[in-house]
From Swiss-Prot:
Residues passing through the membrane, by range: 33-53, 77-98, 113-133, 178-198, 226-246, 288-308, 320-340, 347-367
Ligand binding (heme b b562): H83, H182
Protein name: Cytochrome b
Species annotation: Sus barbatus
Function: Component of the ubiquinol-cytochrome c reductase complex (complex III or cytochrome b-c1 complex) that is part of the mitochondrial respiratory chain. The b-c1 complex mediates electron transfer from ubiquinol to cytochrome c. Contributes to the generation of a proton gradient across the mitochondrial membrane that is then used for ATP synthesis.
Cofactor needs: heme b
């Protein structure tokens, strides 16, 4: 008699994805972040569901409903801060996951990579709309500034912005629809993640060497289930330290002031995980140029397979490309820092140079360096 986990229609899917899945024997801890993202997503959906039970998406009561959650609901403060800081953990895992894909050439799995880029966009949209919901000063002005960027689109821009707002400014209609979208999008993300996994399992995982590992596979369970649990425990430890000791570390103090359309905060800035994009937007004096640059900064990921000129897939044995990769990481950290600074000298010029360097490394330096490495290895 065959095992039920191999014969039952539903169990069979789970078995083939998480138990008997043939996995490369040499994948490192950088491969943990896919499962960590799954855990983050489940955590966000669960905490978000409980927050939605007590939240009201009306401009007059939204701010006080969040205060009510923190003060009056049993463990409401814990749920709220797990959700807020869970988003930060989500983005840390996302950035590392994408970085791993760039470093080890995982973008050569075209379908998996492209679905991943769509997922990145969707998660960013969801996080942005979630930041608007507490209806503090930074929520309101962040929503106003970021949605206003769409008015740079020629001809339809202004109409598009007013259509998104549901009026002539960010108001009740905007808050209600953002809540609706913020609630539904995580389920869209879950569906996309399932497709992402489906395409990945068509090809099998990449590994640090970038060489086919078909002749050396091991079952996912118990080897990688235990490894993923260890990663999850580490992540939960960091998250709990953040939530229980300094829950407001990554937030903005301005968001503890109720939204006031008549009073603009001195420095409008988004959450830390959008600061790199915000720095790119601000580094171009032209509004449309800034919008195009920031969209390009993420859409550029789709071009990665076309920009791959090396004969090797992974950067593991390519020291020159490794230097460029870490330059890119340092550049993104610089952009994140600049995004949180006021628009004044010397931050403006640093932001402009960092933005130019970002595109230069990806579009010019990396492909050229790969060709040089090919020639050095006489390939």
């Amino acid at each position: 008699m065959t095992n039920i986990r191999k014969s039952h229609p539903l169990m069979k899917i789970i078995n083939n994805a998480f138990i008997d899945l043939p996995a490369p024997s040499n994948i490192s801890s950088w491969w943990n972040f896919g499962s960590l993202l799954g855990i983050c997503l489940i955590l966000q959906i669960l905490t978000g569901l409980f927050l939605a039970m007590h939240y009201t998406s009306d401009t007059t009561t939204a701010f006080s409903s969040v205060t009510h959650i923190c003060r009056d609901v049993n463990y409401g403060w814990l749920i709220r801060y797990l959700h807020a800081n869970g988003a930060s953990m989500f983005f840390i895992c996302l950035f590392i996951h994408v970085g791993r894909g760039l470093y080890y050439g995982s973008y050569m799995f075209l379908e998996t990579w492209n679905i991943g880029v769509i997922l990145l966009f969707t998660v960013m949209a969801t996080a942005f709309m979630g930041y608007v919901l507490p209806w503090g000063q930074m929520s309101f002005w962040g929503a106003t500034v970021i949605t206003n960027l769409l008015s740079a689109i020629p001809y339809i821009g202004t109409d598009l912005v007013e259509w998104i707002w549901g009026g002539f400014s960010v108001d009740k209609a905007t808050l209600t629809r953002f809540f609706a979208f913020h609630f539904i999008l995580p389920f869209v993300i879950t569906a996309l993640a399932a497709v992402h996994l489906l395409f990945l399992h068509e090809t099998g995982s990449n590994n640090p060497t970038g060489i086919s590992s078909d002749m050396d596979k091991i079952p996912f369970h118990p080897y990688y289930t235990i490894k993923d649990i260890l990663g999850a425990l580490f992540m939960m430890l960091i998250l709990l330290i953040l939530v229980l000791f300094s829950p407001d570390l990554l937030g903005d103090p301005d968001n503890y002031t109720p939204a006031n359309p008549l009073n603009t905060p001195p420095h409008i800035k988004p959450e830390w995980y959008f600061l790199f994009a915000y720095a790119i937007v601000r580094s171009i004096p032209n509004k449309l140029g800034g919008v195009l640059a920031v969209v390009a900064s993420i859409l550029i990921l789709i071009l990665m397979p076309m920009l791959h000129t090396s004969k090797q897939r992974s950067m593991m044995f390519r020291p020159l490309s490794q230097c460029l990769f870490w330059m890119l990481v340092a550049d993104l950290i610089t952009l994140t820092w600049i995004g949180g600074q006021p628009v004044e000298h010397p931050f403006i010029i640093i932001g402009q140079l960092a933005s130019i360097l970002y595109f230069l490394i990806i579009l010019v330096l990396m492909p050229i360096t790969s060709i040089i490495e090919n020639n050095l290895l006489k390939w």
